[in-house]
A protein has these predicted regions:
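Polytopic transmembrane helical bundles with strong interfacial aromatic enrichment
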Residues: 1-158
Length: 158
């Protein structure tokens, strides 16, 4: 539980710093290195979320998508992953400056607002002890993440 709490806070801090760095890179467009720092910060946040989810998977023996806390962190992981891929392909920092605040809000809500009882893992009900859970929920959450990023970009370029 201590590792989870530490990773929660670290992920929130990294995403907060990355959001500030991305916004500063837009305001101070002469400093191109700020956008690179923001990109690598997003990669770090993505890796930390992966470590959080991986540690829960190893410690509790099931794929971590069975409660709201785990699902929100997986959604934040999907958003940061989509951001990394799109930003790498397009070489623009606008994507990170728009999508990282959403990841920040999601992780902030999951780690700081949800009560401990909702963050704690519980045994899976028999209906969720299926290999289909991992495949179905993973694909759905990744599609939600790409939909969120696409919607944000659509609104931005409107």
């Amino acid at each position: 539980m201590q590792l989870q709490s530490s990773l929660d806070n670290l992920i929130f801090l990294v995403l907060l710093l990355v959001t500030i760095i991305y916004w500063a890179s837009i305001i101070l467009s002469n400093f191109k290195s700020l956008a690179k720092v923001g990109f690598y910060g997003t990669v770090l946040a993505n890796s930390l979320i992966f470590c959080l989810l991986g540690s829960r998977w190893i410690n509790y023996g099931y794929f971590p998508l069975s409660n709201l806390y785990e699902s929100l962190f997986f959604l934040a992981w999907g958003i940061t992953f989509t951001t990394i891929v799109l930003e790498y392909k397009t070489k623009t920092s606008i994507i990170g400056s728009i999508s990282n605040p959403i990841s920040l809000f999601i992780t902030g809500f999951a780690g700081l607002s949800l009560p401990e009882s909702m963050q704690a893992p519980s045994p899976l009900v028999p209906a969720l002890k299926s290999n289909w859970l991992m495949m179905h929920v993973t694909v759905m959450m990744l599609s939600y993440a790409s939909l969120i990023v696409g919607s944000l970009l659509g609104i931005f370029f409107l």
